[in-house]
């Protein structure tokens, strides 16, 4: 799990308004943080298939949110993937 202070930092860095916690940008950033935190675990524990299922679920959810954001506002999408260092 992400520590509360780190989570608040991520929300603050990606929020569109002062109390924004539910925008796609914030949700994608939080999922990216959780995914990045779990990656070393799976390098050390390659046979943790039950945990990997949860990781793949998070990756899929992030992909769906990114697809939604791309369809609604392509400029925000490109800015977000550049900021988070995802692909391209």
UniProtKB/Swiss-Prot annotation:
One of the record's GO molecular function terms: rRNA binding
Gene3D superfamilies per UniProt: 6.10.250.3130, S15/NS1, RNA-binding
Keyword set, alphabetical order: Ribonucleoprotein, Ribosomal protein, RNA-binding, rRNA-binding
Pfam name, any one: Ribosomal_S15
Family matches, as InterPro entries: Ribosomal_uS15, Ribosomal_uS15_bac-type, uS15_NS1_RNA-bd_sf
Any GO BP annotation: translation
CDD domains cross-referenced by the UniProt entry: Ribosomal_S15p_S13e
Annotated TM spans: none
GO CC aspect terms: cytosolic small ribosomal subunit
Superkingdom, natural source: Bacteria
Record note on quaternary structure: Part of the 30S ribosomal subunit. Forms a bridge to the 50S subunit in the 70S ribosome, contacting the 23S rRNA.
NCBIfam families: S15_bact (TIGR00952)
Function: One of the primary rRNA binding proteins, it binds directly to 16S rRNA where it helps nucleate assembly of the platform of the 30S subunit by binding and bridging several RNA helices of the 16S rRNA. Forms an intersubunit bridge (bridge B4) with the 23S rRNA of the 50S subunit in the ribosome.
Family the entry assigns: Belongs to the universal ribosomal protein uS15 family.
Name of protein: Small ribosomal subunit protein uS15
Source organism (scientific name): Polaromonas sp. (strain JS666 / ATCC BAA-500)
């Amino acid at each position: 799990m992400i520590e509360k202070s780190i989570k608040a930092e991520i929300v603050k860095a990606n929020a569109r308004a002062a109390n924004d916690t539910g925008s796609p940008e914030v949700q994608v950033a939080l999922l990216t943080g959780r995914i990045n935190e779990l990656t070393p675990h799976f390098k050390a524990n390659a046979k943790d298939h039950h945990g990997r299922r949860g990781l793949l679920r998070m990756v899929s959810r992030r992909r769906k949110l990114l697809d939604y954001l791309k369809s609604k506002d392509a400029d925000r999408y490109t800015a977000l993937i550049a900021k988070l260092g995802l692909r391209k």
